[in-house]
């Protein structure tokens, strides 16, 4: 092909853009996107609650290891908490989803995300629970032992209920943070709220209103959880004397 033909053809290819769909009005875009965003929000809540449940179980184990009279258990709990709190959650997600297959352990995106979030939030909740347990006056342990209660019975019937009142605000904050942290699992193709918004953006080429809409949904979810937190704190609060 002659050079005088190649040159304008190259310029045409260089500066041409792929056709884009016509922009919708923002109200129409948000109305059309609402069902998809709502579905993503539901999946986000389910994802966060599931991670919170598994994380709470692990946090209880870590907290008990942290207060046990065993240096090995104490050291294991401290090292775990240090690693989880001292490394970015995004890196932990990558290690579990992209790193474990090199060891022969392959996980689907959803289980990998739940494991990563559960393992991460457990470290923070375990410290909250451990601090709440240690915040109870030591004389209550001695009084319980004098009544014939075992260590487990004392923890369950005497120390645990009081420690729960202390730990509720911190545990609730962990759940609120977990709602926002679920957005990170979108990098491993888990279709939660942020991923749902990104999929709509890919077809509409209107990122700003959709990202703002996703942020608004996250904010609403967190506000609802804050309301539940305050209600729970009032229910667990000790009666005041007048």
Language-model features: locations:
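Transmembrane alpha-helices and adjacent helix-loop boundaries
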Residues: 15-242
């Amino acid at each position: 092909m002659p050079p005088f033909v190649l040159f304008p053809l190259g310029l045409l290819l260089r500066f041409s853009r792929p056709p884009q769909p016509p922009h919708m009005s923002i109200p129409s875009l948000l109305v059309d996107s609402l069902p998809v965003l709502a579905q993503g929000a539901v999946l986000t809540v389910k994802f966060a609650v599931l991670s919170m449940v598994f994380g709470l179980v692990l946090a209880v184990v870590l907290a008990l290891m942290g207060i046990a009279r065993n240096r090995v258990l104490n050291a294991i709990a401290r090292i775990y908490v240090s690693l989880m709190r001292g490394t970015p959650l995004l890196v932990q997600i990558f290690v579990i989803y992209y790193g474990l297959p090199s060891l022969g352990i392959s996980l689907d995106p959803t289980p990998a995300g739940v494991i990563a979030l559960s393992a991460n939030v457990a470290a923070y909740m375990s410290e909250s629970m451990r601090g709440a347990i240690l915040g109870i006056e030591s004389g209550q342990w001695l009084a319980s032992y004098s009544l014939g209660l075992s260590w487990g019975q004392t923890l369950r019937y005497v120390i645990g209920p009081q420690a729960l009142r202390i730990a509720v605000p911190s545990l609730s904050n962990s759940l609120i943070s977990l709602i926002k942290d679920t957005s990170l699992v979108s990098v491993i193709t888990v279709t939660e709220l942020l991923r749902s918004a990104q999929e709509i953006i890919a077809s509409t080429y209107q990122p700003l209103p959709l990202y703002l809409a996703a942020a608004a949904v996250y904010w609403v979810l967190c506000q609802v959880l804050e309301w539940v937190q305050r209600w729970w704190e009032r229910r667990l609060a000790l009666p005041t004397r007048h």
